[in-house]
Amino acid sequence: MSTSLPLADRLNRPIGVLRLSLTARCNLACPYCCPDVEEPPGLLTLEQQIRVIRVATRLGVQTLRLTGGEPLLSRRLLPLLEAVAQARRDRSDPMAGLQAVALTSNGVLLSEPMGRALRAAGLDRITISLDAAEGEAAARMAGLQGGAVAGERLVRQVQDGIAAAFAAGFDPSRGELKLNAVIQRGINDDQLLPLAALARQRGMELRLIEYMDVGNRNQWTLDQVLPAAQMVERINARWPLEPLGRPRGGTARRWRYGDGAGSIGVISSISEPFCGDCNRLRVTADGQAFTCLFSAEGTDLKPALASDLQLEQAMRQLWQRRQDRYSEERDPAAAASTHAEMAYLGG
């Protein structure tokens, strides 16, 4: 087996994060994401998923994030976590180099038993997605029928999921439990303060994400983007903030509350792109590798999954060819380009 040093792409960006989607299905229907009802054909097996993770860590990946769709819908989630945890304990295994294993979920299925099982299986961090803290807006952002009643039910379910994660030992003060929210101007930007208040109750970091032109189903337009700077201004006017900056390779520029009640982060891929140090490789549930969230098509890894060596060669060549910097080159005035869908890519 190869023990090569971590590689870099054509813009000298190392590989550092593997985002592995376990499913394209979701139990919500958020309009900006537009998930598929059925899985794509040819899903990776558990053994193939483990091989992808092992080879990625050999190439330099230090963080594994499991995504969807909704990953809690995948029956392979717990077995995969357990296999990764076992490998991390073996110093001879490349996966021993993983510094963090994380999960992104909408939290609806995150019961107390599931929270304990995830923790016991070796999960280090959970990020829960909720785009509104009030009923009508929550239903709208999740694509639910039933208006405010359905939205209020969803918010309660997600709050229960947050409580379950907290009870399982995921500590917000150590960055182990965070809240994500996609913000659209004129759609849910009135939820900034309610979401911040909800996160502050638990001392969680709230990560605010600019509405992005990922996929082709969401009818994205630039005027629906609320720039991150304006999000920060609104929250700072209510609860004063102190800047923390953005770590190299990170997606979020962070602020902490002056009163100590947690922090916020803003992911500003539209208004302040961070392509220059992006270190993420995305692999879909059916084995397509994408070197950019805004890619039109991926590279099928399945033909290379016969051995670690073949897969390493394929992934190394893919990363060495990488020169994506879509967000820095985005031209809103140009005709809309084609992108893979958000739910398929796993965010």
Swiss-Prot record:
Function of the protein: Catalyzes the cyclization of GTP to (8S)-3',8-cyclo-7,8-dihydroguanosine 5'-triphosphate.
GO molecular function, one term: S-adenosyl-L-methionine binding
Binding sites annotated in the UniProt record for S-adenosyl-L-methionine: 32, 69, 129, 212
UniProt name for this protein: GTP 3',8-cyclase
Needed co-factor(s): [4Fe-4S] cluster
Binding, [4Fe-4S] cluster 2: 275, 278, 292
Subunit structure, as described in the record: Monomer and homodimer.
Residues annotated for GTP binding in this entry: 19, 65, 104, 178, 280-282
Cited PROSITE patterns: RADICAL_SAM
Pathway this chain belongs to: Cofactor biosynthesis; molybdopterin biosynthesis
Residue positions binding [4Fe-4S] cluster 1: 26, 30, 33
Cofactor: record remark: Binds 2 [4Fe-4S] clusters. Binds 1 [4Fe-4S] cluster coordinated with 3 cysteines and an exchangeable S-adenosyl-L-methionine and 1 [4Fe-4S] cluster coordinated with 3 cysteines and the GTP-derived substrate.
BP GO terms, sorted: Mo-molybdopterin cofactor biosynthetic process
Gene: moaA
Domain of life according to the entry: Bacteria
EC number annotated for this UniProt entry: 4.1.99.22
Source species: Synechococcus sp. (strain CC9605)
